[in-house]
Amino acid sequence: MHLQYYAISIVSLVSLIDCHKLAFNFNLEINGSDAHSTVDVFLDDYQIITFDGKDIRPTIPFMIGDEIFLPFYKNVFSEFFSMFKRVSTSTPYEEDLTYYYECNYTNNKSTFDQFYLYNGEEYTDKTQEVTNKNMWLTTSEFRLQKWFDDEDCIMHLRSLVRKMEDSKRNTG
């Protein structure tokens, strides 16, 4: 009985240790003639990096001084938004476009999720009409996958988790 209880406990702990998520939240705000882009990167629901359209900054101590991920992500995010140069800013109303992409690694299985928001509401409708909303929906995934695909996400997730755990061991 006790052996069975310990076996279940160990399996549960391994499952918790083996569950991680890396998420990217791309945002493009259009207000009249002004457009502003941002990206927030999360590891296990903790923001680790922020990009303001020009500069990238670590938001958690273990990412300070990073020479691998920060330059790479700055390049990816800059390229991602540079492809939206033709975005229409002549609309008289505000547009808030969000593309959310995440990869999860749980119980030795990779899963991926993504969704799109327009002014805070999820949308999936593709039409032939050329609008910022349709352009964002039809090209965001392609633009990210050009530089960073699902397999890359899992590799980065594992590396960032290792970096986080090493930092905890070295400071704790």
Language-model segments: which ranges?
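Extracellular/lumenal regions of secretory-pathway proteins
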Residues: 2-172
